[in-house]
Amino acid sequence: GAMEVQTARTGGISVVDDLQAPSHGQLEQPRLDFSVRVSGQLAAHIDATCQALWQKLQARAGRKSQSLALRGIQSKSDTLRGLGRKPKQAALVLRDNLSQRRSIERSYLRAIARAKQEVLVANAYFFPSRKLLAALCHAAGRGVQVQLLLQGRYEYFLQAHASRAFYARLLQAGVAIYEYEASFLHAKVAVIDADGRSPWATVGSSNLDPLSLLLAREANVVSRQREFAQELQNRLQAALAQGRQVQAADLAQRPWHERLFDRLAYALARSMVWLVKDHF
């Protein structure tokens, strides 16, 4: 019979060596990234998702005589056995170009809307939708401490400059922005109200950018386990300490050509989003 899967992992960790950057060579410190190991039925659910996708790709490649349709595998609440002794609720949240185009974005929006104390997001590639941007600003406006840990090293033109086009509005709304400079940031994680009544945390493959939210196949694990949320929060706070906080004065003092690049990158990214939305 088929082997029963005991554990599974999901996260943002790349197959590339964490001490190597394709465009920068050897790194002094490894990339900052996260993955989560799950067990039980949630691991089996992840396995079923991978098996179904593998069958679909085999069929598409013509390796089977009949086409195998990928069954819609929905997000499922289950248990995540990790840092705490007792199993707690967790879910696998998927994004594809079929029935689950907005699932990860909706998960973030619901959690941010319910935030009472703190929202802490670490994202390598940050170009939020208008709804996500508004949700972050509204949360800060109602007194929630909103902190973003973003890429502090120059990696790609579009990513580096398009993200900074959002800084002024976020800072004006009261959002704290930190740029991680110890190494390259590759994390796609968030923690909300880790010490509150309804903790929420996610670790996965999805950035808050158009590629992840509109095009790519992504998978995040969402957990409401307090111990898990607090441990992730502690690790992110340590990473914030290695970052540089961006001040409004910093934006005004940037060279004119850098600000021009921000506007150009933003306009290019927005046009790409428009094309993608029109296509899908």
Predicted regions and their residues:
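Charged, low-complexity intrinsically disordered terminal segments
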Residues: 1-280
